[in-house]
């Protein structure tokens, strides 16, 4: 691994070490890191729709994204090993011993373009290294498995059955590019959760639980928008800028989208935007907060494009509607359930 370290890796590590001496949340993103950050926020990419991992000197297929180009092609399967990559009709490049991120960069590409993969099928005998070449047309891939999702938990209390709707929110994502371009189908946490609530109400659930465990945050805008689904109207978070000015972000729409019983699950890894949402639900007495004390991040970052990569820069602090800061304090649950 040390031999595979590039100068770009060293530069990123050095700049981030320097930045952290001033602020733990300001960091530099190399072009590759910036691309992955954008993918995680938009939940979309252009490629073949395969999750890969390093396996000694090879790159192995872990799973295929449902309805993605790789799955639809029916030419590769989980546990197959990729040993070569070619662009269109170009010669295939041997990638044995390559870093995972470098192989991924070769496989990703504009939708409509073709990539050829030299693959050792998992169905081969243990020592059979016979390979085959497959051609896959890249497409826009939606990472739905990383989006908010729902389930229903059936319980019985006092002889009466209850149904709880569970909405797991892994991150506060927002496709900034599509949103700014006016795309009516842009991806966002709030839009997905709103749809899931509608489906759960159709299933006649008795209450809803928003699961923010291990949710490290994301878009400040989405934290505000999601809060607005559950409150009548009013401020959602206070943002204090470096010049001392305080901006009040608020839900301006009358009426809550969902008015029924609800709870919010949090743990030590619930941070930033998760703490804004959980704190607002607690301050408005809108939901019961369950779990463990949250991470304790109370700052706001913005992305500054650079000639080479991006800078995630801290520019403000945020405060709960009550005026309290979550920095180093987190959100203390109403009911502590340490082991969930």
Residues of each region from the PLM?
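Long, structured ligand/cofactor-binding scaffold of large enzymes
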Residues: 1-15
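Cleft-lining beta-strand/loop regions that shape enzyme active-site pockets
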Residues: 3, 29-39, 43-45, 54, ...
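Amphipathic alpha-helical
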Residues: 12-36
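A short acidic/small-residue loop/turn micro-motif
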Residues: 90, 333-334
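Metal-dependent DNA phosphodiester-chemistry modules and their immediately adjacent helices/loops
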Residues: 270-272, 309, 313-327, 331
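Conserved small/polar residues in nucleotide/adenosyl-binding loops
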Residues: 338-340
């Amino acid at each position: 691994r040390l031999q595979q370290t590039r100068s770009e890796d060293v530069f990123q590590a050095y700049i981030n070490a320097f930045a952290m001496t001033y602020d733990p949340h300001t960091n530099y993103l190399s072009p590759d890191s910036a691309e992955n950050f954008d993918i995680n926020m938009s939940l979309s990419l252009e490629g073949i729709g395969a999750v890969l991992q390093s396996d000694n000197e090879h790159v192995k297929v872990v799973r295929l994204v449902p309805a993605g180009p790789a799955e639809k092609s029916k030419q590769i399967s989980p546990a197959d090993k990729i040993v070569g990559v070619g662009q269109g009709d170009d010669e295939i490049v041997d990638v044995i011993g390559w870093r995972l991120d470098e192989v991924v960069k070769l496989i990703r590409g504009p939708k409509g373009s073709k990539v050829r993969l030299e693959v050792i099928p998992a169905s081969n005998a243990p020592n059979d290294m016979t390979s085959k070449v497959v051609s896959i047309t890249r497409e826009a891939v939606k990472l739905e498995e990383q989006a908010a999702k729902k389930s229903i938990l059936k319980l019985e209390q006092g002889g009466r059955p209850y149904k709880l709707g569970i909405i797991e929110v892994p991150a506060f994502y927002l496709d900034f590019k599509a949103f700014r371009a006016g795309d009516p189908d842009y991806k966002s946490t709030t839009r997905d959760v709103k749809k899931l609530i509608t489906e759960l109400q159709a299933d006649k659930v008795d209450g809803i639980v928003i699961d923010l465990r291990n949710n490290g945050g994301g878009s400040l805008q989405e934290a505000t928008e999601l809060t607005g689904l559950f409150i009548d109207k009013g401020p959602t978070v206070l943002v204090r800028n470096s010049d001392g000015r305080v901006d009040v972000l608020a839900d301006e729409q009358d009426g809550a989208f969902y008015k029924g019983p609800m709870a919010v699950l949090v743990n030590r890894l619930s941070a930033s935007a998760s703490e804004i949402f959980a704190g607002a639900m607690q301050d408005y007495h809108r939901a019961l907060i369950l779990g463990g004390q949250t991470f304790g991040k109370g700052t706001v970052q913005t992305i500054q494009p650079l000639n080479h990569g991006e800078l995630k820069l801290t520019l403000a602090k945020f405060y709960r509607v009550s005026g309290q800061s979550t920095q180093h304090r987190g959100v203390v649950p109403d009911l502590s359930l340490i082991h969930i």
